[in-house]
Amino acid sequence: MIIYATAVQTINSFVRLESLKEVYGLIWIFVPIFSLVLGIITGVLVIVWLEREISAGIQQRIGPEYAGPLGILQALADGTKLLFKENLRPSRGNPPLFSIGPSIAVISILLSYSVIPFSNHLVLADLNIGIFLWIAISSIAPIGLLMSGYGSNNKYSFLGGLRAAAQSISYEIPLTLCVLSISLLSNSLSTVDIVEAQSKYGFWGWNLWRQPIGFIIFLISSLAECERLPFDLPEAEEELIAGYQTEYSGIKFGLFYVASYLNLLISSLFVTVLYLGGWNISIPYISILELFQRDQIFGTTIGIFITLAKTYLFLFISIATRWTLPRLRMDQLLNLGWKFLLPISLGNLLLTTSFQLFSL
């Protein structure tokens, strides 16, 4: 009996140990996801504060200054206010579409962050088709906007949803062609491989110098995808009140607000990854990989800092563009996408393909 009891205790302790391993395994799965979401939320709050400060400087006025030091908690205060506001529903709208639309817009953009390499080996999902996964997922967001516009049963909302879909289709194609040119130069669709392909010559190894036309087209197309001035036709205040957001209030309106800045941040991160060398130091023959091999924590920290510095540089350009340029007309926006950016990006892809073939 003593031997039997000892065997039972051994088995029970083994089962408990295996259960603890499974629990710890699940925890370690969610730790990087939670860290990424926390970092994204912090980044969005910083962007909102930066936009308020930069716009105040451009317009020669005082920005937010009461909510926290230098007004840095103003975005948090706005989010809290929206959280406690009443959620109104249009009486004759389509409740399922009206409720699901904002969630689709936010979730589709959030999933795109999984393929962003913030530093060496610091990426949630290093996929062989990472760059195409971003394009595929980001094309889902306009469907949510169209659902929101249709489900609101409002002519302004519906027109805003249609404009969002038309604008996304018009600028998604030139953006995809620019991404194809980059993947041809790097011989890979992985975001990590694209960054590493730019690491050899430092500043001069960036794809910005090898693809200047593609960079400009990608810049314009990404701003149009973010629906920011001068491309904010889907929510033009003078024409459509607030576009597809007209009937929304409370937390659902806040989701659209967050989705706009999430889209701006992911576009800036992809500009950094595709054209500005990602996490690499802009000094020839000095790579983050060398620092990472010496000290992993120090190398990772430096890589994150460099990635975010390049990202926020592009964000400054995007914010300054919003507050300095006038809005385009709808016909001008579509003509720019279909008659100019699409042929130029296609020609750029053909030139890149030709150079790659001749260099073999």
UniProtKB/Swiss-Prot annotation:
<keyword id="KW-1278">Translocase</keyword>
<keyword id="KW-0793">Thylakoid</keyword>
<keyword id="KW-0472">Membrane</keyword>
<feature type="transmembrane region" description="Helical">
    <location>
        <begin position="27"/>
        <end position="47"/>
    </location>
</feature>
<feature type="transmembrane region" description="Helical">
    <location>
        <begin position="129"/>
        <end position="149"/>
    </location>
</feature>
<dbReference type="InterPro" id="IPR018086">
    <property type="entry name" value="NADH_UbQ_OxRdtase_su1_CS"/>
</dbReference>
<dbReference type="GO" id="GO:0009060">
    <property type="term" value="P:aerobic respiration"/>
</dbReference>
<keyword id="KW-0150">Chloroplast</keyword>
<dbReference type="GO" id="GO:0019684">
    <property type="term" value="P:photosynthesis, light reaction"/>
</dbReference>
<feature type="transmembrane region" description="Helical">
    <location>
        <begin position="297"/>
        <end position="317"/>
    </location>
</feature>
<keyword id="KW-0521">NADP</keyword>
<keyword id="KW-0520">NAD</keyword>
<dbReference type="Pfam" id="PF00146">
    <property type="entry name" value="NADHdh"/>
</dbReference>
<comment type="function">
    <text>NDH shuttles electrons from NAD(P)H:plastoquinone, via FMN and iron-sulfur (Fe-S) centers, to quinones in the photosynthetic chain and possibly in a chloroplast respiratory chain. The immediate electron acceptor for the enzyme in this species is believed to be plastoquinone. Couples the redox reaction to proton translocation, and thus conserves the redox energy in a proton gradient.</text>
</comment>
<comment type="subunit">
    <text>NDH is composed of at least 16 different subunits, 5 of which are encoded in the nucleus.</text>
</comment>
<keyword id="KW-0934">Plastid</keyword>
<dbReference type="GO" id="GO:0048038">
    <property type="term" value="F:quinone binding"/>
</dbReference>
<dbReference type="GO" id="GO:0009535">
    <property type="term" value="C:chloroplast thylakoid membrane"/>
</dbReference>
<feature type="transmembrane region" description="Helical">
    <location>
        <begin position="248"/>
        <end position="268"/>
    </location>
</feature>
<dbReference type="GO" id="GO:0003954">
    <property type="term" value="F:NADH dehydrogenase activity"/>
</dbReference>
<protein>
    <recommendedName>
        <fullName>NAD(P)H-quinone oxidoreductase subunit 1, chloroplastic</fullName>
        <ecNumber>7.1.1.-</ecNumber>
    </recommendedName>
</protein>
<feature type="transmembrane region" description="Helical">
    <location>
        <begin position="269"/>
        <end position="289"/>
    </location>
</feature>
<feature type="transmembrane region" description="Helical">
    <location>
        <begin position="165"/>
        <end position="185"/>
    </location>
</feature>
<keyword id="KW-1133">Transmembrane helix</keyword>
<comment type="similarity">
    <text>Belongs to the complex I subunit 1 family.</text>
</comment>
<feature type="transmembrane region" description="Helical">
    <location>
        <begin position="340"/>
        <end position="360"/>
    </location>
</feature>
<dbReference type="InterPro" id="IPR001694">
    <property type="entry name" value="NADH_UbQ_OxRdtase_su1/FPO"/>
</dbReference>
<keyword id="KW-0618">Plastoquinone</keyword>
<feature type="transmembrane region" description="Helical">
    <location>
        <begin position="98"/>
        <end position="118"/>
    </location>
</feature>
<keyword id="KW-0812">Transmembrane</keyword>
<dbReference type="GO" id="GO:0016655">
    <property type="term" value="F:oxidoreductase activity, acting on NAD(P)H, quinone or similar compound as acceptor"/>
</dbReference>
<feature type="transmembrane region" description="Helical">
    <location>
        <begin position="203"/>
        <end position="223"/>
    </location>
</feature>
<keyword id="KW-0874">Quinone</keyword>
